[in-house]
Curated annotation (Swiss-Prot):
Entry-linked Pfam families: DUF5400
Keywords from the named record: Cell membrane, Membrane, Transmembrane, Transmembrane helix
GO CC annotation: plasma membrane
Membrane topology summary: Multi-pass membrane protein
Record's keyword annotation contains Membrane: yes
Protein name: Uncharacterized protein MJ0759
Transmembrane domains' residue ranges: 12-32, 39-59, 63-83, 98-118
Intracellular or extracellular location(s): Cell membrane
Main location (coarse class): membrane
Amino acid sequence: MVIKKGEIMNEIISLVSLSVIFGAMLSGFATFRLTGMRLMPHFASLMIAFILTLASLFISNNIIGYLAIAFQVITPLTVCPTICNILKTQFQNTGIYSAHLALMGMMFILALGNVILF
């Protein structure tokens, strides 16, 4: 079995993506508790992205890999409509959301890296 350089890099970036998604789940839980059910589609998408990314590390299947990347791209986009409305009306609470939004930005960039390397 020969391991190519691109395969190792793909696994590394997937592992980093997984850690960012896990951190986003933790910071997102606090955000989710504050905003209620308005962020449910985003939180569900985040959990699906976590499960698919974890599965793509253990199962060598292109469909699972591409689904993981797709959800890594979709998840940051699902937070935009809800969080923009919240930040307009509750700007004093922006510190609470900043960690989660930063992780969503990192996740989007890592997903683009996954697209290039996959």
